[in-house]
Regions:
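A short, polar/charged loop-to-alpha-helix boundary motif
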Residues: 89-101, 157-167
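Short, basic/aromatic recognition patches
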Residues: 39-66, 106-110, 120-128
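A short, hydrophobic, proline-anchored segment that marks a local hinge/packing element in signaling
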Residues: 133-143, 151, 288
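Short, small/polar residue-rich loop motifs at catalytic or cofactor-binding pockets
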Residues: 65-69, 132-134
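Flexible, glycine/threonine-enriched loop-and-boundary segments that flank and lead into catalytic domains
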Residues: 60, 265-289
Length: 290
């Protein structure tokens, strides 16, 4: 058994930092040519962009159509390596759910993580801004070895809360906002499970949009999976694993350089809300960064 306590996992949500570099990743990075790596990085970005555009074009919900979407390629440990997004705060929606999947389901005999599986999640404790942000991810295997994950996160809209539309302005608890689904397997052998789809559809006011959006995420993920397997066939699994890790390393270094360019000092920014709880009223929030 995985040791899951049938409650929210407070340890996994702390793991926003990249997981430690494995020996396989370290060995692979040492052999990567810089020019070949730049080409690889560009291909990964194009794969993510194609996934995002496919999700937008196939989806049914309004938010999906106008770009409230993120599509990512994740390491096999669950870290986000490459992302294409319409709204940037969605960029990390799949990271914690996939670390949850790796932690709890890989070695769990009643679940497992296998080629052709699909995992769905929308509990904002693990990912998303609110319950209407729903994600689907699939693993990518090459010759029986897990290479990475790919997946899409989308604001579907209708989540079955106390108010239609996915944004419950009068909600007083998280349970007022509808669906709360931790990372679960909803498909095997590249087929979505009809019983789980039926359950999810029954919990919303707009079941057809819910199901069409799920299928759009899966279709985009399958396209990305195919593209990634083409890259692995061309460059080899070691190059791919090392390349994803190098993208993570470079991104971290670039972020540190950008932050280091800021002038030392105290930065203040006030923000205003027009509600106090569920009642009208002005609330001022002061943010100070030192």
């Amino acid at each position: 058994m995985s040791g899951i306590a049938y409650s929210r996992d407070h340890e996994v949500v702390q793991r926003l930092r990249p997981e430690p570099v494995t020996q396989a990743e370290a060995d692979a990075q040492a052999c990567i040519d810089p020019v070949e790596f730049d080409i690889f990085k560009h291909k990964m970005h194009m794969i993510a962009l194609e996934g995002k555009e496919t999700t937008m074009k196939l989806g049914a919900s309004t938010a999906m159509r106008w770009g409230d979407v993120a599509f990512g390629v994740f390491t096999r440990q669950g870290d986000l390596a490459v992302c294409a997004t319409g709204i940037y705060h969605h960029a990390v929606l799949g990271q914690i759910p996939l670390k949850y999947v790796v932690k709890h389901w890989v070695d769990e005999p009643s679940v497992g993580v296998n080629d052709g599986d699909s995992f769905f999640y929308n509990d904002p404790f693990y990912a998303g801004v609110h319950n209407a942000d729903m994600g689907l991810s699939i693993p990518v295997f090459y010759k029986g070895e897990l290479m990475c994950f790919v997946g899409a996160a989308v604001h579907t809209g209708e989540a079955g809360g106390t108010e239609p539309g996915g944004t419950c302005n009068t909600a007083k608890t998280k349970y007022d906002e509808g669906l709360l689904v931790p990372p679960i397997k909803i498909g095997e052998n590249y087929q979505l499970r009809e019983d789980i789809l039926n359950m999810l559809a029954a919990m919303t006011r707009d079941p057809r949009t819910m199901i069409l959006d799920i299928k759009a995420r899966l279709a985009a993920a399958r396209i990305a999976q195919r593209r990634i397997l083409e890259v692995i066939e061309e460059k080899g699994p070691e190059f791919f694993i090392g390349g994803l890790r190098r993208i993570l390393t470079q991104t971290g270094e670039a972020a540190k350089r950008r932050v280091s360019q800021l002038n030392d000092g105290i930065y203040r920014q006030p923000r205003f809300l027009d509600t106090v709880g569920t009642d009208p009223g002005l609330t001022k929030i002061n943010l100070t960064l030192i």
